[in-house]
């Protein structure tokens, strides 16, 4: 007898989920910046995934730090798509994992990462509120506040912890 995989998982106490974004695309008019694709047809896909047993979904938005980026347009475009995705998930009975990720590539300092992540989280939560997303019904998957991989000065773990905690406390309702 063939047992659906999701049923097997449920019997083991495992709740299945699925990544629903369709990767990143170039943000038109904004060189070196990306937006996440996948909102087209998402309602239909979520209904199908729910029927198949998925109870959570993941959507990742990437924000790059570099010369004059991220732009306000990039932050808003990604926050907007995260909020629309989260709203659609909740309407479908699926818990959204909201992942606004400020990338660690580059040479930026921990202070720059902190500044950008604070802006990003503030705008993401404004957009989630605008789309009537029940915040208690999401899982936030944020980045840590860290120095970029190629930054000549790497912050110690205490500074990473302190700035990450302060950023989350300041911006997450």
Predicted regions and their residues:
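Glycine-rich, proline-tolerant flexible connector loops at the mouths of alpha/beta enzymes
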Residues: 1, 29-30, 61-74, 102-108, ...
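Alpha/beta catalytic barrel-like cores
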Residues: 1-52, 65, 153, 157, ...
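Short, well-ordered coil/turn segments that N-cap beta-strands
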Residues: 11-16, 52-55, 90-96, 129-138, ...
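Glycine-rich anion/phosphate-binding loops
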Residues: 31-46, 70-85, 118-119
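Hydrophobic pocket-lining residues that define ligand/cofactor binding sites across diverse proteins
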Residues: 49, 86-89, 128, 168
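Conserved, mostly hydrophobic/aromatic
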Residues: 59, 98, 140
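Active-site acidic/histidine proton-transfer and metal-coordination neighborhood
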Residues: 74-97, 101, 105, 110-115
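Active-site capping/gating regions of soluble enzymes
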Residues: 108-173
């Amino acid at each position: 007898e063939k047992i659906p995989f999701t049923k097997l998982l449920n019997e083991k106490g495992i709740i299945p989920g699925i990544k629903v974004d369709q990767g990143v695309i170039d943000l038109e008019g904004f060189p070196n910046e990306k937006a996440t694709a996948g909102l087209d047809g998402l309602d239909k896909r979520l209904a199908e995934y729910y029927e198949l047993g998925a109870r959570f979904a993941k959507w990742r938005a990437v924000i790059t730090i570099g010369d004059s980026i991220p732009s306000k347009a990039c932050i808003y475009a990604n926050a907007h798509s995260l909020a629309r995705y989260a709203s659609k998930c909740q309407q479908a009975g699926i818990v959204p994992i909201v992942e606004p990720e400020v990338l660690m590539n580059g040479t930026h300092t921990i202070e720059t990462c902190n500044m950008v992540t604070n802006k990003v989280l503030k705008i993401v939560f404004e957009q989630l509120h605008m789309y009537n997303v029940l915040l208690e019904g999401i899982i936030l998957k944020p980045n840590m506040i860290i120095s970029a991989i190629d930054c000549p000065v790497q912050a110690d773990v205490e500074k990473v912890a302190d700035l990450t905690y302060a950023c989350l406390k300041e911006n997450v309702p």
